[in-house]
A protein has these predicted regions:
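N-terminal Rossmann-like dinucleotide-binding module
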Residues: 1-46
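Beta-strand-loop-alpha-helix segment that lines the small-molecule cofactor/substrate pocket
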Residues: 61, 66-124
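Glycine- and charged-residue-rich phosphate/anionic-cofactor binding loop of Rossmann-like
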Residues: 27-29, 297-314
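C-terminal glycine/acidic-rich active-site capping loop/insertion
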Residues: 122, 234-305, 330, 334, ...
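Conserved SAM-binding strand-loop segment of SAM-dependent methyltransferases
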Residues: 48-55
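Basic phosphate/pyrophosphate-binding loop/patch that engages nucleotide-derived ligands
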Residues: 108-116, 131-144, 232-236
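Rossmann-like dinucleotide-binding domain that binds NAD(P)(H)
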Residues: 152-223, 229, 243, 309
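Hydrophobic residues in well-ordered beta-strands that form the structural core
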Residues: 53, 92, 117-119, 148, ...
């Protein structure tokens, strides 16, 4: 039985408490948050959990083996280093840190043999996303040409990070998982209408393989979207996280030129529809799968699928996007990123 403590009881932390509490091989023994009301809500639902206002006191007193850090990204380095120093296994929510310097420091942080440091990139544990990856690598869609991601909603607007820092880590993680390579350059633009940090953003990642990935994120759209499209030479994959019954579609369409006698041009490109396949996918709550994986890593000593290096790569791309946006969208080479948060 692995004893779990959760630091951070805001919007996402209680979901970790619920998932670990429902697993047979885990026990949630403590939670921490400086917000007494947030801690109280968790305590009301899970009376057996010991509440703490200060995570430092939790580290001193709570009899836990592992800690989940679900706090603002700016606090991740301090809290994660303290947890590791106390000998705990750590699962830290995305992003690993709010700057590449802190992320690099965590990647280099000394850990005892078998001590686990995992980053919570939840879509790596989504069955439909993993099916997309399988279909790419078995040649079903041919050569990948480009990827388009959209992650939008009407709020919640945050003051501590830009919309890139809030939403884009999901799509960056998905793209890296699907392509298994780092981008060569990143370019981005941010628009500010509500929060000074930027509440609408477009990011473009260019890869050495020739693939271009575009990520659109917004806090201002009226419709909640969680979509990923992968366009190949033979077919396209369409992932819609809001479609619970059919999250993935394989669209087998071809684009060809044929004669046209209209006044609009000599040739007209037309898309010829073919089969649309809905693959059968056994969907489970990705957060539950992620929690199970964390426990398996603790029990076996295996390296997490979303390890600290994986989290560092996402942070490097985020930093490149933020820098590009400050330079009116000029491309930023990944090799040119600083190694400190100064």
């Amino acid at each position: 039985m692995t004893r779990i403590a959760v630091i951070g009881c805001g919007r996402w932390g209680p979901n970790y408490v619920r998932n670990f509490a429902e697993l047979d091989n885990a026990e949630v023994v403590a939670v921490s948050d400086p917000n007494a009301e947030a801690v109280g809500r968790v305590k009301h639902r899970f009376p057996e959990v010991e509440p703490y206002a200060d995570y430092r006191k939790l580290l001193q007193e709570a009899p836990c083996d592992a800690i989940v850090v679900v706090t603002p990204a700016s606090t991740h380095r301090e809290i994660t280093e303290a947890c590791l120093g106390a000998g705990k296994h750590v699962l830290v929510e995305k992003p690993l840190a709010d700057n590449p310097g802190d992320a690099l420091a965590l990647a280099r942080c000394a850990r005892a043999p078998g001590q686990i440091l995992m980053v919570g990139h939840i879509f790596r544990f989504n069955a439909a996303i993993n099916k997309m990856r399988d279909l790419i690598y078995d040649g079903t869609i041919g050569q990948v040409r480009y990827i388009h991601c959209a992650r939008t909603n009407l709020g919640p607007v945050r003051a501590d990070v830009s919309v890139f820092g809030d939403l884009a880590p999901h799509d960056i993680s998905i793209v890296l998982h699907l392509l298994n390579e780092m981008p060569v350059t990143v370019s981005a633009t941010l628009a500010t209408y509500v929060e000074s940090g930027g509440d609408l953003g477009i990011m473009r990642m260019r890869f050495e393989s020739g693939v271009v990935a575009v990520v659109y994120v917004s806090w201002l759209d009226p419709r909640k979207r969680r979509e990923v499209e992968v366009i190949g030479s033979n077919a396209a994959l369409e992932f819609d996280d809001m479609n619970l019954s059919e999250p993935l579609r394989i669209s087998q369409k071809a684009l060809r030129a044929e004669p046209s006698y209209s006044t609009f041009g000599e040739f007209q490109f037309v898309a010829h529809a073919s089969n649309v396949i809905i693959p059968a996918i056994e969907m489970r709550e990705p957060l539950r799968v992620q929690c199970e994986h964390f426990l398996q890593c603790i029990q076996t000593g295996r390296q997490p699928l979303t390890d600290v290096e994986d989290g560092l790569r996402t942070c490097l791309i985020l930093a490149a996007a933020e820098r590009s946006a400050q330079m009116d969208g000029s491309p930023v080479a990944l090799a040119g990123l600083p190694e400190s948060g100064q």
